[in-house]
Amino acid sequence: MRAADGRTSVFKSGVKRLLGRAGFDIVRSTNNLGGVDDFIPFEATMRAARAAGLSVGDHIDEVMNRTPGATQSTIDELRALGVFAANPNTVLEIGPGSGRYLEKTLKECSPDRYEIYETAAPWANYLVDTFSVVAQPTAGCSLAPTPDGSIDLVQAHKVFNTVTFLCASRYFFEMARVTRPGGRIVFDVMTETCLDPAAVRAWASQGGAGHDSYPAAMPRRTCVDLFATLGCNLEASFLAPMGVASTEVLVFAKGA
């Protein structure tokens, strides 16, 4: 995946293998059916964003995912909840992909260190070069290179809707491990809150073919109870747009 030529074929041939690992920024079907067709190609996306006069993140929200303002609305909610008011000195993001949440996070706070775990090499290199973040080596669903209790804010956006239950669960344990006492953990999952009959009907009728585990559901109570056993309590939650329906963003605080 590091070679420039043949990148498209590599992405396509590796889809099934790589979807088992979080960290890719994915795009819904171009007909807005809510299914995952492919990983976002680096060069084509950069060209299209420049041609449209948009940032990469806004281009993905408005043109590719057809959910204009979705990223900013999530950041606005997190700001209102005081997530950035604590001025996190260290931030870790799982699967930043194109960096649309990363870029807006850096407009809200100025951490000394921002770690990323991103398996798409072209995007990881772009984020390192553009935002001076630290790209950690990826291996399955592990954050092993990051020490225990070293991160003030751990976040993952639109990641756990695309991976299996086992992968998400393993990441949950890792997120709690690396968060310092008093730190926060932010991520979204498609919980039962997002799955009323109308939403299920929308996914069934408009969601396209889906792709492997996408869209993956996760019980809200499972997340809340698990993190409670790891010393992390749910502070707040809110819904954010995803595909033809929504996903629930959960904000946890790790006990001091």
Explain the meaning of each model-derived region.
Residues 155:
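A conserved beta-strand element that flanks and buttresses the S-adenosyl-L-methionine
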Residues 158-159:
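Short catalytic micro-motifs in class I SAM-dependent methyltransferases
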Residues 169-181:
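A short glycine-rich, Lys/Arg-flanked "PGG" loop and its adjoining helix->strand segment in the class I
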